[in-house]
Amino acid sequence: MSQSDIFFDHKHIWHPYSSMVNPLPCYSVISAKGVYLKLKNGKNIIDGMSSWWSTIHGYNHPILNKSLKKQIRKMSHVMFGGITHPSAILLCRKLLKLTPKKLDCVFLSDSGSIAIEVAIKMLIQYWEALGQKRTQILTIKNGYHGDTFSAMSISDPNNSMHKIYNKFLPKNLFAETPTSSFHKEWNSIDIQSFKKIIEKKSKKIAGVILEPIVQGVGGMNFYHPTYLKEIKKLCKAYSIPLVFDEIATGFGRTGKFFAFQHANVIPDILCLGKAMTGGTITLAATLTSRNIAHTISSSKVSCFMHGPTYMGNPLACAVANANIKILEKNEWKKQVINIEKQLCQSLLPLIHHPRVVDVRVLGAIGVVECFHFVNMALIQKFFVKNGVWIRPFKKIIYIVPPYIISMNCLKKLINVIEKSLDNDTLFNVENI
């Protein structure tokens, strides 16, 4: 990669969550292997982000690579409208085997945000088929569900990165975020805000959508499993479909294969993505019940009106099958347990640091919440200089490493986080 390439990138390529006038620095990665990213200058840095929760087995995994090579000899892509293929059929078989029996219809798509859009369209079309104009979604504050329009409309309306679009988005309903954290006692007051809304607006609510247990980049909150149980009771009482967004948490990240298993509740619709292909190619899925699928399919329209160009892409399905085969060996369970133990041992004590508000650990997720906003450009540079890749946001420094990470590499991630907390220049103290 030449200096000309870097200059071109800086001038012409618009990176995510960045500016074209004053862009954040971009670090040139030329290859990746295991938990390491290799920079242009030859330096290897430890990836603490799993490329946004996705590369759970690390980079360049031989089994995943082999599945791609095998599939590409047959076909790299074919449209899914009116056509099917073995890789998609096998993947849907595997997904049905992994998920609750109630969820027996699978709609494939090409990203997590689209999986959410599909779920919302299913809800609206479901009620339309029943002769009811229900279009509002009930969720909770501090959530994040993606960057497309319907996904933005159910992400936190005030504190999210999407608030500049608020006046253009559908108006949905937001209950207060539960305050009972995962590892502490349940407080029944937490359900009251949600209960009041569902009691008052039940005839307008098309569905409830939540990130189960773990709220992602809306704030990295881990809430009590009882909250999900109470939500399920209310949804059942008012016959409102319940949707779980497991795009970030699915496939073992929290210590359970799916986060909703911590509460032993079953949704009516389930959205999956990110780690489904082991972070190799983009792929997502929305699973729903036979009741919802048949209600939609028995309406005047009779069809579900959605069809992404790359839906059911054979390469993506093939590598997803290989990824699930790795997970079926169950080595991930021990890996995540070991990560959680190390995070509890070494990350949790940072709660005593004067810059830190809270430290949270669940499965292979570690979160340090600070009093001050990070200076994104400076802290990113600091992390890279110290041999790690961590991408914070707002006041949150968090890590979601690949499950295969060694304890020495994990300790290094934690040590560099601790070191960053001692550096005043990395935080915008005025933005309290």
Swiss-Prot record:
GO CC annotation: cytoplasm
Keywords of the record: Aminotransferase, Biotin biosynthesis, Cytoplasm, Pyridoxal phosphate, S-adenosyl-L-methionine, Transferase
Binding site for pyridoxal 5'-phosphate: 112-113, 245, 308-309
Single GO BP term: biotin biosynthetic process
CC cofactor: pyridoxal 5'-phosphate
Physiological role: Catalyzes the transfer of the alpha-amino group from S-adenosyl-L-methionine (SAM) to 7-keto-8-aminopelargonic acid (KAPA) to form 7,8-diaminopelargonic acid (DAPA). It is the only aminotransferase known to utilize SAM as an amino donor.
Protein known as: Adenosylmethionine-8-amino-7-oxononanoate aminotransferase
